[in-house]
Amino acid sequence: PVNIGGALVSNASLHNFEEIKRKDIRVGDTVWVQRAGDVIPQVIGVIKEKREKKLKPISPPEICPVCNSKTIRDKIKTGKKEKEEKYIRCTGAFNCSAQLIERIKHFSSKSAFDIDGLGEKQIEQFFHYKWINEPSEIFELEENYLQDLLEKDGWGARSVENLVNSINEKKLIPLEKFLFSLGIRHLGECSS
C-alpha cells in the first residue's frame, strides 16, 4: 500500500484489458497512480525507465480466479463488422461467488435501492454467513437472521434496528431504480 493524497491505496483500477494493452503494462512494472476525482485510484501509466528487460506482457485471463469458469469477450456487431467487447467476463454466473456478491452490492448501491447501513463490508459478511445469496434475500434478513445478527461483533440493538428500518423503507422504490438494480447488461442508470 502507498499513500496518495492522504489515502492509503492498495488497489488501482485499469478499467478493462484494453487499457492494460494500450498502456503496455507488464507484470513487475512500476506505475504512476492517481486518484481520479480525488476518489478512485487508477493507473495512469508505466515508468518505462524503471522497467526491467524481459518483463512479460500481461495475458488476458482465460479462467475466472474465483470459480474456475471459462472467461469470454462478447462480440459486438457494428454495421457489417463484428468486434470483441472491451470487457472480459466470467461465464460462471450464479456459480461464481464473486459475481453473486457484486450483484448484491449493485442491487443495494446508491443508484439502486440505496439501503443505509448495508455497504460492501456488510454484504460480504452476510454472504459469508450464507444469509444473503441473492438480492431478494436482503428483504428476508429481519425475518430469518435478526437474532443471529444481534450476536455478531459490531452489531448492537441500535445498529440492527437502523438496518431493519432502512431495508423496510426501501421496499418500494421508483421503477427506474428497480430496473437499474437488476444489473441487466447494457441497461445503465440513464437508460433505465
Model-derived regions, located:
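Structural signature for extended repeat/solenoid scaffolds and their inter-repeat hinge/linker regions
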Residues: 31-192
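Short, structured beta-strand/loop micro-motifs enriched in basic residues and often containing a Trp
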Residues: 4-18
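A general structural signal for short secondary-structure junctions and capping/turn motifs
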Residues: 22-24, 33
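Short, well-ordered loop/turn sites that connect or cap secondary structure elements
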Residues: 24-25, 132
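Nucleic-acid 5′ end/cap handling module spanning
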Residues: 1
